[in-house]
Amino acid sequence: MHNTLPTLILGAGPAAIQLAVDISATGDARLGLYNRPSTKGERLKQYLALTPTLYLQGTGKAQATQKESSVTIDCYIDQLAQAVGDWQRLILAVPADHYYAVLQQIPWAALPQLKSVILLSSSMGSGLMVQNLLNAAGKRDVEVISLSSYYADTKYIRAETQDISANTQDINAGTQDIGAIQPYRAYTKAFKQRIYLANQWGNAGSAEMSWLTAVLARHHIDTLPCSNLLAAERFSITNYVHPPLALADTTLQALFYPEQRSQYLYKTQPEGPVCPAVIADLAGLADDYKRLLNRLGVEEINLLRFLNDDNYPVPASMVSRRWIDEFPQLPPLEQQYALFVRYTALLVDPYSTPDEQGRFYDFSAVKVATVYQDANALWHLPRVPLEDVHKLRTLLLLAGALDVVMPTAQRLLQRFQQALKAFIDRVGEEHCHPSLLGDDCDRQAAIIEQQWRSQT
């Protein structure tokens, strides 16, 4: 679909590169990029000033639809006060827990032609919060669209090698080794099978919804429109999967003690956190979300069907169709057993081509990133679990305001907060970045609640 709306992408990570390439392929829209001031951002700014081009290539399964491509960036800004002029579409390509801070800085009055704000990787309640902020800015007619998650798996290509196979499966690749990445060059190794999306009006036929459907269809991604923002956002996979794994005791030990041996987020103990107790937390958190979603007037998901059919399928010899289709009705212990079997089935990619020794691709070798220090010697937490903690805390606060109990979420957060406090006590508060010491989750939860109540 030909679409020429001037588009400003807020965020400049690997996902933004894939997105920019896809937008360029659907029309000759003017493209802008925002990135907050940082070491990586300064390198990107200097590079684009000389060569205003970003590069992308596909690898593995993604090569079927993503060839080597480049895209011209017409405008780069590193201050949100510069987000002015004739931009008609804003796309949030920053982590969902950053939406509030980013949108608070937008000079809305200086965007008179704005038509839409698109959330590339939303969390539950993100759309309501954005809608509330737009209403307060006098932008009630701006269309808000939530995607259930980012539609691909995209990484930076690292500077020391052009061989993308050498890039490690680090869930925070480049976070601790900024100099090793090329912030203008990325590769995509897979696309999602299905993405859920919705706008605040439940209008699946809007021009922007149709355009997004066409963009994703380039990569044979099914798009399922939902009746409202929350209905799409309930399918955010990281909300379900990351907290039980990233906030497990063994993962937190690896996170806060980087000198110890590595851990892998999706491996079974002792290499990773996956064990029956952690899988019980996964099932328990899904039950927490079920209660919250039902209170918000949204139907819960079939967790096993979502994990298998929409994300990473496993052979039926491991997880039967009966388990998948009847998952909500299974007894709790059988649910947990089915989930445990699924995660053991994904220790390797069962559909990869085995090597000469008969070994399949080590799908679960996703290394747990650890705390790290910046150029000012301040300690930071990597995106996983910091983003997940913020999202979970916001939802727990929202649940409390709506008299919904979420015991598993509460226990996971308490475990994290105890581990964080012990770390801060060990290194000293003065040596910690402010992101370790506070957040705006309470404000975000209050805004979501306010917007939800105004619509019910």
UniProtKB/Swiss-Prot annotation:
Binding site for NADP(+): 12-15, 35-40, 154
Assigned keywords, A-Z: NADP, Oxidoreductase
Catalytic activity: yersinopine + NADP(+) + H2O = (2S)-2-amino-4-{[(1S)-1-carboxy-2-(1H-imidazol-4-yl)ethyl]amino}butanoate + pyruvate + NADPH + H(+)
Enzyme active site: 242
Pfam families assigned: Staph_opine_DH (PF10100)
GO MF terms held by the record: oxidoreductase activity
Keyword Membrane: no
The protein's role, per its UniProt record: Catalyzes the NADPH-dependent reductive condensation of pyruvate to the intermediate formed by the adjacently encoded enzyme y2836, namely (2S)-2-amino-4-{[(1S)-1-carboxy-2-(1H-imidazol-4-yl)ethyl]amino}butanoate, leading to the production of yersinopine. This is the last step in the biosynthesis of the metallophore yersinopine, which is involved in metal acquisition and thus enables bacterial growth inside the host, where metal access is limited. Therefore, this enzyme probably contributes to Yersinia virulence.
Quaternary structure (record): Homodimer.
Name of this protein: Yersinopine synthase
Organism name: Yersinia pestis
Lineage: Bacteria, Pseudomonadati, Pseudomonadota, Gammaproteobacteria, Enterobacterales
